[in-house]
């Protein structure tokens, strides 16, 4: 049969631009571990939020004025007079916080399951560069509404660069473009926020994904699925990413969008955490707010800065809290990747790290008090202790044996068959049968009856086994 003109046109394109090969290599024929769980939603959600930020950012840029005299009014114009402008603005502001939420959860999953360990060190490095670029993008975008908190928050952060010896003052002046935050600062931040940093973000996302698909995805058990393959060369413990995980991610996207829409339509300010109340007031260089604090996703690092008395040492501490994350692949000396098979020391250390990070984030939103400062110093010590002591406690911790392949997943038919075999024995254990004799009419018709009653001891044994099994699955 002669191919149609449309087919010929498609083949002509594919001969010159291998879309099908790209799709097969990175989706249809890319094998991912078959035991992905809830924690593996957040990578795809981060891509979704990035697309949302780019599209809504373009729409906002069409009406925004990067001028110190017009910036605040242009935001009000978008909110009040541009059709659906309020929705676009709230999608962008909520998307910024959502971006950091999914990124923080994505990073936590990487630490928990050892996704930074060999051979995925470069994936982790690209991911951390992405995180730094995202922080720069968020900081520069934070100034654009030109509200009170935007102005003074940027003033505080930029002034930190002046603490650097020798070059500090000149560096701060170069960043601002003026002796104070003014129109020049707003223009250069707008250019970086809209053009330069997004290009870096897209490039780093591409490099992150290429490195990931080269060495393969990690999994909750920390097993390398490429080490065992079937006769066709496919990983025994893997399944094609499409359609299995694309469908799974669609479910995650649906649930995420439900929460995302709820925040946008019912609480876009999130109690002053997503959009600060002070930012609804135009920037006034002559009036300092009573309490200056950055957006919530910067507050853990801001709290570390405030916990250290010396200004330069505080800047070093804040920068070091990010730099130490880059060194994680070489700080962890444990041969086991996943937390499922690691010792109790690492689990407790990770729990303390999470508590310290959340506590630092909360303290960063609160005014400075003596008690808050003491707590911030304590949690700062725990934060750095998790990383700096890692070469010691990870080398000596006791680990569990790691299985050579992923746990076999039985089919539904096999599960029912197993249940049919085990159910009679289970009933016999949790019940006690006692024979009863009864005469019906003539003694020749004497019959035996049985009474089945609960067996307390058997029930306790069954519950104990179930509890041990549940604890083992959680470990």
Regions flagged by a language model, labelled:
Residues 1-98, 102-423, 427, 431, ...:
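Membrane-embedded and interfacial regions of multi-pass energy-transducing membrane proteins
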């Amino acid at each position: 049969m002669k191919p149609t003109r449309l087919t010929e046109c498609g083949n002509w394109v594919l001969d010159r631009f291998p879309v099908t090969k790209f799709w097969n290599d990175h989706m249809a024929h890319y094998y991912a571990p078959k035991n992905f769980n809830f924690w593996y939603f957040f990578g795809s959600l981060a891509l979704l939020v990035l697309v949302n930020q780019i599209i809504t950012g373009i729409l906002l840029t069409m009406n925004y004025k990067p001028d110190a005299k017009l910036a605040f009014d242009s935001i009000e114009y978008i909110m009040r007079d541009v059709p659906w402008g309020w929705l676009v603005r709230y999608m962008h502001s909520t998307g910024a916080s959502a971006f950091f939420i999914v990124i923080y959860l994505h990073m936590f999953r990487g630490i928990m399951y050892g996704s930074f360990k060999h051979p995925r060190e470069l994936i982790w490095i690209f991911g951390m560069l992405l995180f730094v670029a995202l922080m720069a993008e968020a900081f520069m975008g934070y100034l654009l509404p030109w509200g009170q908190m935007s102005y003074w928050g940027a003033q505080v952060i930029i002034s930190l660069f002046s603490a650097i010896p020798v070059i500090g003052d000149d560096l701060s002046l170069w960043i601002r473009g003026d002796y104070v935050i003014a129109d020049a600062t707003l223009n250069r931040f707008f250019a970086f926020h809209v053009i330069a940093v997004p290009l870096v973000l897209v490039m780093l996302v591409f490099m992150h994904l290429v490195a990931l698909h080269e060495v393969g995805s990690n999994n909750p058990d920390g097993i390398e699925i490429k080490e065992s393959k079937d006769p066709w060369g496919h990983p025994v413990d893997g399944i094609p990413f499409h359609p299995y995980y694309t469908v799974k991610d669609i479910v995650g996207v649906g649930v995420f969008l439900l929460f995302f829409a709820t925040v946008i339509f019912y609480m876009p300010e999130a109690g002053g955490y997503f959009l600060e109340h002070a930012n609804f007031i135009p920037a006034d260089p002559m009036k300092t707010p009573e309490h200056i604090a950055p957006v919530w996703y910067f507050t853990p690092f801001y709290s570390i800065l405030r916990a250290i008395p010396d200004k330069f040492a505080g800047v070093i501490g804040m920068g070091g809290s990010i730099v130490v994350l880059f060194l994680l692949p070489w700080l962890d000396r444990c041969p086991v990747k996943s937390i499922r098979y690691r010792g109790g020391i690492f689990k407790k250390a990770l729990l303390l790290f999470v508590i310290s990070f959340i506590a630092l984030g909360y303290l960063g939103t609160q005014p400075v008090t003596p008690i808050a400062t003491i707590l911030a110093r304590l949690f700062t010590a725990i934060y750095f202790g998790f990383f700096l002591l890692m070469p010691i406690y990870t080398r000596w911790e006791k680990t569990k044996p790691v299985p050579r392949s992923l746990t076999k997943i039985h089919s539904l038919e096999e599960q029912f068959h197993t249940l049919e075999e085990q159910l009679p024995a289970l009933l016999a254990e949790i019940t006690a049968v006692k024979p009863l004799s009864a005469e019906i009419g003539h003694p020749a018709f004497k019959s035996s009856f049985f009474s089945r009653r609960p067996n307390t001891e058997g029930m306790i044994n069954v519950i104990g086994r179930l509890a041990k099994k549940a604890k083992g699955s959680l470990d």
